[in-house]
């Protein structure tokens, strides 16, 4: 009987030790993730700030022509807008991680249509053909968040496409709720990059992304919105063909 009690205590202690080790490993990973996040954030802040300070100092110290002043002001403005975009998206990401949202049943079709319509100027500017295949699909959502999800995914698709590309947006009702498909005929992604694209500040083509004003938070925001809706987001992509 004594041996049995000792055995039970030993098993309980082993289980507690394993749980403690597991929690410590999770905490260690969390700290590493936070460290990586802060490192990426510091880098993203440093680049535009360096440009702003550099051009402001040039204007302060040098006698520039009107054309040179205009060019310097243009760089300061564009980098300032990039900083603003970064701070706004970062605030949104933090809110998504810490706020509770009220869900209500709603049809996705008019909401997706509204999101696509609001992007009409950019779609025309890039000469993008839009294929919409929308049907009634009712599920529990937070309307503003879902619209933000659609806008971010379309924005991401537009950044990958050249003039004359094709954007397809579809929805489909399911037993669990709904599926939304957004596909493009853009440059696509390497297979080994797909698992990383929803990480904050991660960008596949950094030079192209910076030129387009991207800060690497759009898909991280999408990931959080999908998590809040207890859904999942999958990417299928082929280089040179689209995503």
Predicted regions and their residues:
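Membrane-proximal HAMP signal-relay module
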Residues: 1-38, 53-60, 95, 200, ...
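Short acidic helix/loop segment immediately C-terminal to the autophosphorylated histidine
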Residues: 60-67
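Short conserved segments within the C-terminal catalytic ATPase subdomain
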Residues: 122-131
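Short alpha-helical segment of the dimerization/phosphotransfer core of two-component systems
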Residues: 78-83
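Short conserved segment of the HATPase_c
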Residues: 189-203
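Short helix-loop "hinge" at the ATP-lid/N-box region of the Bergerat-fold HATPase_c
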Residues: 157-158
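Acidic ATP/Mg2+-coordinating residue in the GHKL
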Residues: 184
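Conserved micro-motifs of the catalytic ATP-binding
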Residues: 97-103, 134, 138-144
């Amino acid at each position: 009987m004594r041996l049995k009690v000792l055995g039970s205590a030993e098993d309980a202690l082993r289980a507690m030790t394993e749980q403690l080790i597991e929690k410590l490993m999770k905490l260690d990973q969390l700290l590493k993730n936070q460290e990586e996040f802060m490192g990426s954030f510091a880098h993203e802040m440093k680049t535009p700030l360096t440009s702003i300070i550099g051009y402001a100092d040039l204007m302060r110290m040098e006698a520039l022509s009107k054309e040179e002043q205009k060019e310097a002001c243009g760089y300061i403005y564009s980098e300032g807008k990039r900083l603003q975009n970064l701070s706004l998206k970062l605030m949104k990401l933090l809110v998504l991680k810490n706020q509770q949202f009220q869900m209500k049943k709603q049809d996705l079709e008019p909401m997706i249509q509204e999101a696509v319509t609001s992007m009409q100027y950019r779609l025309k500017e890039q000469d993008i053909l839009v294929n919409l295949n929308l049907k009634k699909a009712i599920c529990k959502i937070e309307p503003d968040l879902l619209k933000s999800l659609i806008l971010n995914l379309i924005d991401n698709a537009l950044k990958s496409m050249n003039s004359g590309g094709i954007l397809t947006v579809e929805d489909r009702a399911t037993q669990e709720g709904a599926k939304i498909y957004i596909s493009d005929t853009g440059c696509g992604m390497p297979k080994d990059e797909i698992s990383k694209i929803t990480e904050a500040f991660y960008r596949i083509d950094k030079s192209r992304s910076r030129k387009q004003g991207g800060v690497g938070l759009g898909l991280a925001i999408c990931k959080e919105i999908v998590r809040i809706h207890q859904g999942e987001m999958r990417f299928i992509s082929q280089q040179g063909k689209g995503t």
